[in-house]
Structure formats: C-alpha cells, structure tokens
C-alpha cells in the first residue's frame, strides 16, 4: 500500500499509520461515541419515571447536550487542525465519561441537564464526527476519501446497532444508573485506540487559504454553497435527534413494547451500515449533492408513513429499516463536499461549523418534540414538520455547487465575520425568498394545527403558538 500521507514528515517519534489502522481507530471511536449517544432514547422513560420529571425536561437536557456539542465543535476542530486530533479526542472522552458518571448520581432535572447536557455535550464536541472525519479525511487521499469517510461513519451505526439493545438489557437487569457503567467502560477503551489519528499532514493543499482558520472562514462564509450546506445539515440534525431521542416513546405511545422500541433504534443502526457503505461507493461515482437530495426526499416519505400508516411491530421495524438506510448516510457526503470545496488543511474547523448547524437543528428536534408531546400527548405534528423539512432539504441541495471555490469563475471574496452568519445570510437576495417561504410554511402548519385538534379542545389555540414559537427564526409573530 501507498500510505496516505506521502507528504508527511516521518521521524522516529511519528510514523505514518497504515490505512487499516486509521479506519479502525476512527471507526472504533465513532462506534463508541455515537453508539453511547444513540442510547439516550432508551433512557427517557426510566429516568423520567425514576426522577419524576417530564418528557420535556429530559428533552431539554438532550437539547442542551446537542447545543453544547455543536458550539464546541468548531473550537475542537480548530484545535485539532493545529495540534492534532488524538489529543482532542482523548480530552473529549474524559468529559464524556465524567458526564455519564455525573448522570448516574443525579437526582433532579437540573442534575440531568448539567451531566447529560453540558458535560456530555463537551465530551461529544471532542469525541465525534467533526474531529474524527476531519482526521481521516486528511490522512486518506482523495481517490478513496469518500469510501473512507463512509466506512468511518458506518461504524457509528454499528455502535448504535450493538449498544442500544445491549443498554436496554442492562437497564432492565440492573437499573438505569448502573447501566451507565457500560458506556463509561467502552469510552475508556475508545480513548486508548485513537493514537493512529495523531499524524497531521504538513502539505499545503492548493485550495487551502493562507493565514490560518480565520482566513478560510472568511472565504467559506462568502461561498454560497457552503452556507447552503450549513442550512441543509440543520435539517439532518433535526431529523436524527428527534428520531433518536423520541422514536422509542412514540412507538410506546402507539402501543408497542419497550423491547420493540429499542429494537427499532437498533434496526436503524443496522440498516445504516449498509446504507452508508453504499452511499460511500455511490459518492465516488455521482454528484454528492444529488445523492443528498435523494436521501432527504426518502426521509420525508418515510416520516409521512410513520403518521398515516397504522403502527404494528412489523411496520415499526420496516419503517426503521427504511429510515436506517438514509440515517447517517448524509454525513460522509456532506463531509466530502466540504473537502472538495476547501481541501483538507482546515477540515476540522470547517466541519465544526457544519456540525454546529447540525446541532442547532438537533436542539430544536429534541427539545421541541418533548414540549410538543407534553402539551398534546402526541408526536404526530412533529412527524409532519420533519417531513416538510425533508422536502426543503431535498430542494436546497439541488442548488449547492461541489466545485473547489478557487475553480469558480467568480471565486467568493473573503467576508468579514464580525457581523455574524445571520447577517450574511440575510443580505442575500435569494435568502429573503427562503425566509419568506419558511414563514409561510410555518403559518400553514399553525393553521393545520387547529384542524388536527378537536375544535373543543383548549389546547387548539396553544398548539399553533408553540409550533410558531419553536420554529420561526425570530420567535412567534404578534
């Protein structure tokens, strides 16, 4: 094999890792980190019942986790770009372990929010996709990068497939507090395996901007396709966290057992292994943006099915299989597009901002769904919202350009960052139409809310207000 990193400086203290070691290290870290993260859904019932807190309170803790995770990822990515990924991954693992241990000692909703929310969120910022995929992308050459990213992502689904039912069994046998020891042990193992990811390429890719992370960010936020990619990945975050956290409860509300609910999450993980690997292969042969549009469209259809088709154990597993095929398949494609656009030198910080957008969507997907169910006793409206966002995501990706920014006829000019991303997006004429459309969709959804609830219900007026408050970008109108 030609080792990926022929431009690396090889010394007695640092040798170039073979491809298998890179993928195994990245894959194991991803499997454990994402696998443990995927078990949060099976903890919802036992924690809320034991502590006497609401679904919304638990959803808020996980929403905080996603927000802290997202906010920390650009920082973790920038540190990894400069000092190497392994140190960041180990630091993330330490926070992750401490967060789970603190959760085991928590007795209030505030304790859960601090432990599973803030501390675990910091751990995930260091030990998650943004850092791992950036490292793998740097160490693997472009010809096999899509497959390598897909393989690493697929390990995350493998972790979900194995750990969700295993954790459910541990909860049933020992209780939710003691079951956290399983995640702590596996995280310690993952931390010890990340050293093959310590090497950093010293080459200067043609697409890398000179002047460090701030310079590349000025260019990235001036590139419309990168900004659209951020918005698209917001939809992914909304979908994944809403389903990962609330699918078990939704199925139990529909009359399914906790075993079926846990098996449904595991089925998503199992089928995503094949789906992600297939997407990695397709990503090397077709435009990634078109594949992403297809994935979001399939999600939308699957979400509609969850509402309109009567639930049964068989349908629960069948729909989970369909969702699983497109579950994390968006991650390697989105990551590959960023690498195509800007090269590998600043992948960590650029991935970090993409995943920050993902986690903002995750915050709304987890917290909003919990509030919605507490208020109305059903998740139906949220499934429809997820479907609408899937359609929007599919359309959005048709307008994203994969070309390296420096190959464009009119390369993006560096933008000043002091006015913030929102101002940059708002100043774009096309975005005005997008915002107007969003407000229109949410207004229609509010009207739909009145029609879906019995006219005599006192909740009818509140439902539309809650939807608008959660999803209009500037809060409720009026």
PLM region spans:
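Hydrophobic core of transmembrane alpha-helices in multi-pass small-molecule transporters
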Residues: 31, 99, 111-127, 234, ...
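Residue-level signature of mid-helix packing/kink "hotspots" within the transmembrane helices
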Residues: 38, 66-74, 160-161, 269-277, ...
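Extracytoplasmic gate region of multi-pass secondary transporters
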Residues: 40-44, 223-276, 365, 440-456
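Conserved MFS/SLC helix-loop-helix module at the cytosolic interface between two early adjacent transmembrane helices
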Residues: 71-109
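Helix-to-loop junctions at the C-terminal end of transmembrane segments
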Residues: 72-84, 276-287, 373-374, 477-478
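Cytoplasmic helix-loop-helix junction between adjacent transmembrane helices
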Residues: 116-154
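Helix-loop-helix hairpin linking two adjacent transmembrane segments in secondary transporters
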Residues: 152-200, 378
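C-terminal transmembrane helical hairpin of 12-TM major facilitator-type secondary transporters
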Residues: 268, 286-337
């Amino acid at each position: 094999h030609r080792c990926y990193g022929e431009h690396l400086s090889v010394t007695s203290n640092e040798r170039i890792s073979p491809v298998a070691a890179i993928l195994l290290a990245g894959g194991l870290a991803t499997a454990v980190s994402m696998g443990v993260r995927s078990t949060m859904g099976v903890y919802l019932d036992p924690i809320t019942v034991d502590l006497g807190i609401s679904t919304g309170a638990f959803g808020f803790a996980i929403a905080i986790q996603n927000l802290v995770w997202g906010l920390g990822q650009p920082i973790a990515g920038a540190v990894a770009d400069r000092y190497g990924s392994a140190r960041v991954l180990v630091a993330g693992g330490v926070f992750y372990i401490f967060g789970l241990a603190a959760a085991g000692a928590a007795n209030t909703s505030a304790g859960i929010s601090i432990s599973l929310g803030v501390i675990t969120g910091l751990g995930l910022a260091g030990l998650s996709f943004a850092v791992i995929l950036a490292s793998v992308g740097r160490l693997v050459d472009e010809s096999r990068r899509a497959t390598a990213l897909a393989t690493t992502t697929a390990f995350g689904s493998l972790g979900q497939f194995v750990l969700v039912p295993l954790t459910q069994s541990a909860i049933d046998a020992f209780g939710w507090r003691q079951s956290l020891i399983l995640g702590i042990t596996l995280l310690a193992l993952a931390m010890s395996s990340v050293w093959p990811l310590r090497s950093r390429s010293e080459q200067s890719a043609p697409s890398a901007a000179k002047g460090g992370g701030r310079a590349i960010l000025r260019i990235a936020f001036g590139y419309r396709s990168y900004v659209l990619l951020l918005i698209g990945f917001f939809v992914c975050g909304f979908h994944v966290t809403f389903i990962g956290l609330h699918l078990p409860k939704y199925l139990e509300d529909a009359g399914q057992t906790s075993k079926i609910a846990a098996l449904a999450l595991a089925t998503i993980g199992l089928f995503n292994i094949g789906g992600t690997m297939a997407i990695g292969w397709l990503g090397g042969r077709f435009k990634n943006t078109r594949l992403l549009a297809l994935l979001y469209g399939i999600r939308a259809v699957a979400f509609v099915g969850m509402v309109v088709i009567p639930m049964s154990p068989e349908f629960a597993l069948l729909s989970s299989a369909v969702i699983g095929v497109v579950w994390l398949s968006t991650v390697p494609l989105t990551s590959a597009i960023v690498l195509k656009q800007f090269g590998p030198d600043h992948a960590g910080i650029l991935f970090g901002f993409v995943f920050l957008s993902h986690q903002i969507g995750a915050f709304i997907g987890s917290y909003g769904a919990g509030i919605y169910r507490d208020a109305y006793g059903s998740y139906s409206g949220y499934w429809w919202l997820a479907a609408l966002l899937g359609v929007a995501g599919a359309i959005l990706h048709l307008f994203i350009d994969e070309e390296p920014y420096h190959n464009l006829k009119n390369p993006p000019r560096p933008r000043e960052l002091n006015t913030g991303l929102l101002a940059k997006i708002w100043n774009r004429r096309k975005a005005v139409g997008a915002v107007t459309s969003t407000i229109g969709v949410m207004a229609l959804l509010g009207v739909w809310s009145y029609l879906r609830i019995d006219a005599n219900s006192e909740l009818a007026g509140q439902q539309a207000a809650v939807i608008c408050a959660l999803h209009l970008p500037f809060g409720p109108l009026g």
